Amino acid sequence: MARRCQLTNKKRNNAFAISHSHRRTKRLQEVNLQWKRIWWEEGKRFVRLRLSTKALKTLKAKGIGAMAREAGIDLNQF
């Protein structure tokens, strides 16, 4: 499974690791992904998703149904 948020499609970022002498080498900044069981009110059940912590924060404000509709995700498949 790809390291990608299932709601926002957030993925890893290319960056540089900069040493003390300012030499730059490429590195990857991974997304902070967490497995979460979230209560889906419309479906009357829990849904298990792999979400970024940014998506979790947004989820508290918008709700799982609204975010899934924006992302075009059918929660019945999870």
UniProtKB/Swiss-Prot annotation:
Pfam families: Ribosomal_L28
Cellular component GO terms, alphabetical: ribonucleoprotein complex; ribosome
GO molecular function: structural constituent of ribosome
Coiled coil: none
Keyword terms, alphabetized: Ribonucleoprotein, Ribosomal protein
Organism superkingdom: Bacteria
One annotated GO biological process: translation
The keyword Ribosomal protein is annotated on this UniProt entry: yes
InterPro entries per the UniProt record, alphabetical: Ribosomal_bL28, Ribosomal_bL28/bL31-like_sf, Ribosomal_bL28_bact-type, Ribosomal_bL28_sf
Annotated family: Belongs to the bacterial ribosomal protein bL28 family.
Listed name of the protein: Large ribosomal subunit protein bL28
Gene: rpmB
